[in-house]
From Swiss-Prot:
It is an enzyme of class 3 (hydrolase). Substrate binds at residues 77, 175. A divalent metal cation 1 binds at residues 94, 105, 232. One of its GO terms (molecular function) is initiator methionyl aminopeptidase activity. Its EC number is 3.4.11.18. GO terms for cellular component: cytosol. Keywords: Aminopeptidase, Hydrolase, Metal-binding, Protease. This is Methionine aminopeptidase. Belongs to the peptidase M24A family. Methionine aminopeptidase type 1 subfamily.
């Protein structure tokens, strides 16, 4: 069931989203060669809690981190640990914060130092595909209009959209209806209504679209070992379009 939020609920979710965005700003300052993903996790957890929120991911189905930290060929759900970031890596950081009972959720892929032109293009195309999807997020549109816009931008540029992981509704639960694929034909699915809150999060591979899960039962990697990127915002559908909630 898709739950439309009241204005009171949206006010809380704006603050949850703001805390997520501020945490991303803080983390970005520390993403540099030599830091471990565990240290980034500690910085994020401290920052989230200092703003009166709790990490959405910590303890979620047994997940041990406060953030997901996925490096290079790791797509999503990377467990923070002793991996040391190196010059030329890329790292996808997924952050969730729960504030007064409601969640905000946003992911971003960052360069570690100087990266190759190829990797920068992957990041640029994935980020732009997110915003191409958001352009379709408006009352009266169909859910899959977002999906189609993302795929139509990324795949003609030589990249592959991951099928197994999708966007989702957000609210008092981190993952709510509806599920939102990042591929497919337009004009399908439920009509968008004001008050819907959605996390749109294209995951794009430089090689094939196929992924697998490592033996830790969390970390998802590309089958061919090529790099991948992940960009996500939580948005609210409004009468006139959409509002990004995960912004500072």
């Amino acid at each position: 069931m898709i739950i439309c939020k009241t204005e009171r609920e949206l006010e809380i979710m704006r603050e949850a989203g703001r805390i997520v965005a501020l945490t991303h700003q803080e983390i970005k300052l520390h993403i540099q060669p030599g830091i471990t993903t565990k240290k980034l996790d500690e910085i994020a957890e401290t920052f989230i809690r200092s703003h009166g929120a709790t990490p959405s991911f910590k303890g979620y189905n047994g997940f041990t981190g406060s953030i997901c930290a996925s490096v290079n060929e790791e797509l999503v759900h990377g467990i923070p640990g002793n991996r040391v970031l190196k010059e030329g890596d890329i790292i996808s950081v997924d952050i969730g914060a729960k504030y007064n009972g409601y969640h905000g959720d946003s992911a971003w892929t960052y360069a570690v130092g100087n990266i190759s032109d190829e990797d920068q293009d992957l990041l640029d195309v994935t980020e732009t595909s997110l915003y191409k999807g958001l352009e379709q997020a408006k009352a009266g549109a169909r859910l899959s209009d977002i999906s189609h816009a993302i795929q139509s931008y990324a795949e003609p540029r030589g990249y592959a959209i991951v099928r197994e992981y999708v966007g989702h509704g957000v609210g008092q639960n981190l993952h709510e209806d509806p599920q939102i694929p990042h591929y497919g034909p337009p004009g399908k699915g439920p009509r968008l209504k004001p008050g819907m809150v959605l996390a749109i999060e294209p995951m794009v591979n430089a090689g094939s679209r196929y992924v697998r899960t490592l033996s830790d039962n969390w970390t998802v990697v590309t089958v061919d070992g090529k790099k991948c990127a992940h960009f996500e915002h939580t948005i609210a559908i409004t009468e006139t379009g959409y509002e990004i909630l995960t912004k500072a």
